[in-house]
Amino acid sequence: MAKISKRMKEISAKIDAEKKYPVSEAFDILRDVSSVKFVESVDVSVALGVDPRKSDQVVRGASVLPNGTGKTVRVAVFAKGPAADAAKEAGADVVGMEDLADEVKKGNMDFDVVIASPDSMRVVGQLGQILGPKGLMPNPKVGTVTMDVAKAVRDAKAGQVRYRVDKAGIIHTTIGKVNFTSDALKQNLEQLLTDLKKAKPSVSKGIYLKKVSVSSTMGPGISVDFSDLNI
């Protein structure tokens, strides 16, 4: 059995695993137990009342967090003509078509998000085996295949997070950094949960938002009471 580090023992002593903490208190605890030399992300896990084995219960989508994620996001856009010009004006870091595809094939992928106009998918479609495993393949369900590439670029730059339910029925994503104020993190969490509720499959029965936990990059999960959130 692996030994529990002294740091983790000290952290665990401050957290009641059986308790659901008020959201702001949970964020305070994350800051209190953060002892690493970098600014940790604040991550959230949301257990949903869905059966992801069934295709009509796979929850996926995107949420634009009002206070961003605290990360600098590099965006690549596959587009041409006016759409390419609009993407550049919106702040895209890389814009192209076949030339951008060639760079991807060479392994030159210095970007975090890929957006594509519908007419560029003939080019992007050939890159599925490269972009797919990295989670970069554009998809209309999360707004990364779109006629309005400029808006997609602005959303990505503003702090859009994408999510997809895993095999256990859980959504994992980030809602900011530990140096965000509790109010900023709370607003981001509220936006995410609001968007998740909108994405509820019509066939999902019973309790949909079952459990919400927050954690820092190197910290333990803390179950939160989300009943008083504005969602």
From Swiss-Prot:
Database matches in Pfam families: Ribosomal_L1
GO molecular function, one term: tRNA binding
Alphabetical keyword list: Repressor, Ribonucleoprotein, Ribosomal protein, RNA-binding, rRNA-binding, Translation regulation, tRNA-binding
CDD domains hit by this protein: Ribosomal_L1
Keyword field contains 4Fe-4S: no
Any one cellular-component term (Gene Ontology): cytosolic large ribosomal subunit
Gene3D superfamilies: 3.30.190.20, 3.40.50.790
GO biological process, one term: translation
Stored InterPro entries: Ribosom_uL1_bac-type, Ribosomal_uL1, Ribosomal_uL1-like, Ribosomal_uL1/biogenesis, Ribosomal_uL1_3-a/b-sand, Ribosomal_uL1_CS
Keyword tRNA-binding carried by entry: yes
Record's signal peptide: none
Quaternary data: Part of the 50S ribosomal subunit.
Function: Binds directly to 23S rRNA. The L1 stalk is quite mobile in the ribosome, and is involved in E site tRNA release. Protein L1 is also a translational repressor protein, it controls the translation of the L11 operon by binding to its mRNA.
Family according to the record: Belongs to the universal ribosomal protein uL1 family.
The protein's name: Large ribosomal subunit protein uL1
